[in-house]
Curated annotation (Swiss-Prot):
The keyword Nucleus does not apply. The chain crosses the membrane at residues 6-26, 37-57, 69-89, 103-123, 128-148, 163-183, 206-226, 238-258, 273-293, 301-321, 335-355, 379-399, 413-433, 458-478. Its EC number is 7.1.1.-. It is a multi-pass membrane protein. HAMAP family: NDH1_NuoN_1. The gene is nuoN. It is an enzyme of class 7 (translocase). This is NADH-quinone oxidoreductase subunit N. NDH-1 is composed of 14 different subunits. Subunits NuoA, H, J, K, L, M, N constitute the membrane sector of the complex. GO terms for molecular function: NADH dehydrogenase (ubiquinone) activity; NADH:ubiquinone reductase (non-electrogenic) activity; quinone binding.
Amino acid sequence: MQPSSTLAPVAPIIFLAIAIAAINWIDLARGKGKQSVAYPLSLLTTLVLTAWFGMNAATGETHYAFANLVVIDPMANVLSAFCAAGLFVTLVYTRRYLAERDMFAGEFYMLALFTLGGQIVMITGNNFLTLYLGLELLSLSSYALVALRRESRVTSESAMKYFVLGALASGFLLYGISMMYGATGSLNLGEVFRAVESGRINTTMLAFGVVFIVAGLSFKLGAAPFHMWIPDIYQGSPTAVTLLIAGGPKVAAFALFIRVLVEGLLPLASDWQMMLVVLSIISLAIGNLTAIVQSNLKRMLAYSTISHMGFVLLGLLSGVVANKADGAADAYSSAMFYSVTYLLTTLGTFGIILLRTSKGFEAETLEDLKGMSRRNPWFAFLMLVMMFSLAGIPPTVGFYAKLAVLDAVVQAGMTWLAVVAVLFSLIGAFYYLRIVKLMYFDAPVGEEQLEATFGLRSMLSVNGAAVILLGLFPAALMNLCYQAIRSTLGS
């Protein structure tokens, strides 16, 4: 641990704030008659942040800033780099979609960068208030993005649902934080940990605080039964916004769980571990069983997300066995690996869906994917790779991610829970393979061909190659996650 008296550790966050202000000013100064420069400047910003956090991660150092409100450790650097890279890919995938719908404007890119800022603050927070600030920055930006097409009744309705339910979840989280503060007298995660570990705290207040905090966090992660917002928001939002919500925020939510439950409330593991067991089973059940009956593509992927968050929770709950955290690094790194690879696969999936859309046409139903292999065999193959990864079929990275989490669950002595997860995964494979069947064995609807620029084609190809190569050679990324988690647990 290295307390810092300079702003060097948080320089990337400051750079992002300056970049957002600069892009806003430049875009306003150019006026509406000229082409927006927000897109190339946003790409440049995300590239710089990816490289910056990546180089910081290579040092393996941990720094604290702003009176311990912020911690820049290897986990923060690695996850922030992936979030920035994920936004870069998202911006590339969504460019054509936005241009065809008159959404190719500066406000979209500034709000997207604000969501990235919220994710980074969530990942680097070392204080309940800092974490809440990052969460609200992400949430408020997301509300605005969902409502960006003001002329659409569907998106306006989705934004209102998102806002109301998000405010309710924030209230739950704040109430839980207030109870923790009342019991421990501090909002700093390290001080809360030591106060709870001392055993001199009112256990009733702590237990109620944990319940409200886990409920609030589960809403943000998208775990059942706090999942009500996900299907409606995924379906009602413009597909470009759906991708923004479905990707990086899930990685940041994982970091939020680690910061709060592991770094702050680990002595209460016996309380929150059983809560996560219940939440994970419900998420796997509702996500997989409900996705089967969906005909809307984005709604199906929404329920798919819920089931995947169940797997993330499985990794998180496996770190503590009989109140001992001996295998914590392995378990938490498996959940981190799962979150990162889920981001990678989600990007590829929605990238293909965005490619299938056109001006005046939204690829929203499963029927829209019929015969894709005849329109463009390469893009159909990439979609097949993404579906195999989401289903956990080798040799894709999704298979190894599920295997790593299941191994952690078994090592934690909960073999029965691993069996339940496998059974629901087998059920879930049906709706992923149904998409493959539609692409390869059904006749196409319409005559249009799938066309993409060289840049978009290259990005999708790299995305697909990464899903396969990381499935064949997962050791490097798994070791990166393990070292980051081990450093965080030891700091």
